[in-house]
Amino acid sequence: MARNATTSSAATAPSEGDPNISRPMNVTASSSEPAINPTLTDTPTATFLRQSTAMQDATLYPGGSRSLSGIAVHAFGLGLALASSILLTILLLHLSNPLWRLPSFIAILSVFHFLEFYATARYNLPSAKLSSFLLFSNGRAYNIAHTCAMLEIVLVCTFFPSWLAVVSAPWSRALGLGLVLMGQGIRSLAMAQAGTNFNHIPAKQHKEGHELVTRGVYGWLRHPSYFGFFWWAIGTQLLVGNAVCGVAYVLVLWKFFSDRIRGEEEHLVQFFGEQYVNFRERTGVAIPFIR
């Protein structure tokens, strides 16, 4: 009789349950603390949580050097500037208004600054930052030069339109457009082929993984990005008919690249030794009077 009572009591008592049913835990006899079952943690949710924790990079937040919201705003602004400039250029050309030069110059600048960031983000992701757009990080002289170019366009077109017949012939505009396209293409190609070896700021110390690129466009030009920018900039001034800024661009850019190449190559010889010396001997710069 007692046996039956015991059996009945056990049957009616609430079940403690198996902890392995309600949660992915294993309880061992030697420990009262549940242990995480390693076979149950490799789930999409667990993987997402681990990745989310790893992505807590302060530079990606607003105000950071790689701020995603900042990148979005910059890209949107450049796209808006490009679209509106193209439409305004077409309208002013249709009206035979010489001021078409101003929006066309802005359109070219918009493409340049977008491609600077895009090429960096696409082929050199670790170096991609807000500053890669080069909108506000390319030096005060750069911004002053383009501001002066815009002012010359407005002043000449408004007060001295007859001067354009002298300095802006159809052939010079065609040559300018050709130089812009060639220069932009070679610069972007150079950034793509250099990959992570490209940097907007010349390296002064040899970092691990930095290689000397000698393939592709680097097989003919040892500084193709400088070549591209030099002729791109001159092309913009030929296209818009800026005589004063055109001459100033040539002089300032030649001086800038002459000094920069000389200083940069001193470090490159230190980094790569005889390999760079031989590379320098068989390639050129293609900027007048810079060897």
Question: What kind of region is each of these model predictions?
Answer:
Residues 2-208, 235-291:
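Membrane-anchoring alpha-helices and their flanking helix-loop junctions
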Residues 201-229:
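Active-site-proximal inter-transmembrane loops
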